[in-house]
Amino acid sequence: MPELPEVETVRRGLAPAMVGARVARVTLRRPNLRFPFPERFAERLEGTTVLELARRAKYLTAHLDSGESLILHLGMSGRFDVRLPDGSNLSPGDFYLEGALGTPKHDHVVMAFANGATVTYNDARRFGFMDLVATRDLETCRHFASMGVEPLSDALDAPRLARLFARKITPLKAALLDQRLIAGLGNIYVCEALHRSGLHPALPAGALAKPDGSPAPKAKTLVKEIKAVLTEAVAAGGSTLRDYARPDGERGAFQHGFRVYDRVGHACPTKGCTGRIGRIVQGGRSTFFCETCQVLPVR
């Protein structure tokens, strides 16, 4: 599933084609994706102009001049193909590039714009979805109401992290992946941020808060590294594993800078560390970390 940097990369690729453009026609080639389309979905989109294309965690939101916002979630394999007015093509979020995945038979939604551009949503697995909600109700809608703080926003700082994690015995990695606390973090970038911070993924999350609720020293370090990892990943166009490419069709490059993710047995890249990267399973997901410089304190 694409994480925050990949979704932000898709947003940046779609924005030039969509923002300021009027939706002329919407074609639905099936009645549903993961969920049924909203009532009168195509009718409510047609004739509207896209004022802004934003991102909330791992969701895209297109704010329309009708007072509604289109919410888009890519699921596991969602991608967009864009045909620009000049006839050129982009693939902002080109997932599953080989075989049947990503072929035209999985083109489920086609949006034609008055400027001649066409945006096609393709989703082989159909885990993605689209919804329409009143823009004024966006933050309280069912998709976002319980969502936590944005990790790249100024709202996430060491005191906020300490308040979120205070007295929690949940493993630190699980707490970071809890979208009700911090929205948008995924497995890859949590593993990377924890390694840079020198924190064991199984450390109780509450260890980042002092008894009085103020941040422990490592809380500031972790916040800094979360923001650094995400910022670097966005700049690199996301991470390509087997299914992701940048808006221009090129592969994302951040995977070349992975320190621990999917690097079991490799030497730890931390200067002076002689350890190797290990793997454990937490919550059904692989966790990668250095067995030497990310030590779980003995209690």
Curated annotation (Swiss-Prot):
Binds 1 zinc ion per subunit. Its EC number is 3.2.2.23, 4.2.99.18. A zinc finger (FPG-type) spans 259-295. GO terms for biological process: base-excision repair. It holds the Pfam family Fapy_DNA_glyco. SMART domains: Fapy_DNA_glyco, H2TH. Keywords: DNA damage, DNA repair, DNA-binding, Glycosidase, Hydrolase, Lyase, Metal-binding, Multifunctional enzyme, Zinc, Zinc-finger. DNA binds at H106, R125, K168. The active site is at P2 (schiff-base intermediate with dna), E3 (proton donor), K58 (proton donor), R285 (proton donor). The keyword Metal-binding applies. PROSITE patterns: FPG_CAT, ZF_FPG_2. It catalyses: Hydrolysis of DNA containing ring-opened 7-methylguanine residues, releasing 2,6-diamino-4-hydroxy-5-(N-methyl)formamidopyrimidine; 2'-deoxyribonucleotide-(2'-deoxyribose 5'-phosphate)-2'-deoxyribonucleotide-DNA = a 3'-end 2'-deoxyribonucleotide-(2,3-dehydro-2,3-deoxyribose 5'-phosphate)-DNA + a 5'-end 5'-phospho-2'-deoxyribonucleoside-DNA + H(+). InterPro entries: DNA_glyclase/AP_lyase_DNA-bd, Formamido-pyr_DNA_Glyclase, FPG_cat, MutM-like_N-ter, Ribosomal_uS13-like_H2TH, Znf_DNA_glyclase/AP_lyase. Its cofactor is Zn(2+). The keyword DNA repair applies. GO terms for molecular function: 8-oxo-7,8-dihydroguanine DNA N-glycosylase activity; class I DNA-(apurinic or apyrimidinic site) endonuclease activity; damaged DNA binding; zinc ion binding. Belongs to the FPG family. NCBIfam families: fpg (TIGR00577), PRK01103.1 (NF002211). Involved in base excision repair of DNA damaged by oxidation or by mutagenic agents. Acts as a DNA glycosylase that recognizes and removes damaged bases. Has a preference for oxidized purines, such as 7,8-dihydro-8-oxoguanine (8-oxoG). Has AP (apurinic/apyrimidinic) lyase activity and introduces nicks in the DNA strand. Cleaves the DNA backbone by beta-delta elimination to generate a single-strand break at the site of the removed base with both 3'- and 5'-phosphates. Monomer. This is Formamidopyrimidine-DNA glycosylase. It comes from Methylorubrum extorquens (strain PA1).
